[in-house]
A protein has these predicted regions:
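PAPS-dependent sulfation machinery
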Residues: 68-184
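Post-Walker A helix-loop "phosphate-sensing" segment adjacent to the P-loop in P-loop NTPases
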Residues: 56-66
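Charged, amphipathic alpha-helical linker segments immediately N-terminal to NTP-binding catalytic cores
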Residues: 1-13
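N-terminal signal-anchor transmembrane helix
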Residues: 17-35
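Anion-recognition interface
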Residues: 188, 192, 198, 238-245
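Glycine-rich phosphate-binding P-loop
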Residues: 37-58
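PAPS-dependent sulfotransferase catalytic core
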Residues: 219-245
Length: 245
């Protein structure tokens, strides 16, 4: 697993460097964009709103699961689309295998519908530099993500500058890959601790904040985290915190 992960990360790094050869279709600076960011705690209804808006592809460019975890760069997306185009000429065996994996493996995830072609949280992009809340799913220790929960207050200025540039570059690459859409759309529970960062990068950004009854939200969040830790990690107690749900 470690070898496969290393190869995948190396391929992404090389592709990232090669993206500069493609140029940029958009002349606007990041600060001139008007992305829409959906904020809210885990299990507060953000996914439903996000995926509903994401269907309006004329206005919104939302990242899909495959774009986040398999192809965050433009070069990778062009390569995979080319492979699928050739695959289609031979009866699409690769596409069928992907759909089977999507249905049998990702479809088994509870609480939160997951699919390669579903709009998903771009917090997954921060797994590449290992610097986001999703690290918590693999290593469920509070100290592992403590600083990232309160990003604006606790992340050091030096690391913050690096991660800010990285996140803005990911958005630029995504917009360049989707010229049919006008605005970037994203939702993340982690945005609650990154409002200053988002406003700093995108002064013209728009925000939607969702609230849910705290008791119902907390119980749902505990159920989701219990499932996630069982699915991604190997806890001594199969569903930790389930008693709070």
């Amino acid at each position: 697993k470690r070898s496969r992960t290393t190869r995948s990360t190396s391929f992404t790094r090389i592709s990232w460097a090669c993206d500069s050869l493609l140029g940029d279709r958009r002349s606007a600076q990041p600060s001139e964009h008007r992305p829409l960011f959906i904020l809210g705690n885990f299990r507060s209804g953000t996914t439903f709103l996000y995926r509903t808006l994401a269907k309006d592809t004329e206005n919104f460019a939302a990242m899909k699961t495959w774009e986040i975890y398999l192809a965050p760069t433009r070069i990778q997306r062009m390569l995979y689309r080319g492979i699928l185009a050739v695959d289609a000429a031979f009866g699409a065996p690769i596409l069928r295998a992907l759909r089977r994996f999507d249905s049998e493996q990702l479809g088994a995830v509870e609480f939160h519908k997951v699919g390669l072609w579903e709009a998903e949280e771009d917090e997954g992009l921060l797994l590449y530099p290992w610097a986001g809340l999703f690290v918590w799913f693999f290593f469920p220790y509070r100290h592992a993500v403590r600083d990232f929960i309160r990003y604006d207050e606790r992340v050091t200025p030096r690391l913050r500058r690096r991660l800010d540039r990285y996140y803005a570059a990911c958005i630029e690459k995504h917009l360049a890959s989707h010229p049919e859409s006008r605005y970037y759309l994203a939702k993340n529970p982690s945005f609650c601790g990154k409002v200053q960062m988002l406003r700093r990068l995108y002064p013209n950004a728009r925000f939607v904040f969702l609230q849910r009854d705290p008791v119902a939200q907390f119980r749902s969040q505990m159920s989701w985290l219990a499932f996630a830790w069982d699915y991604f990690a190997d806890p001594m107690e199969r569903y930790p915190f389930q008693r709070f749900a």
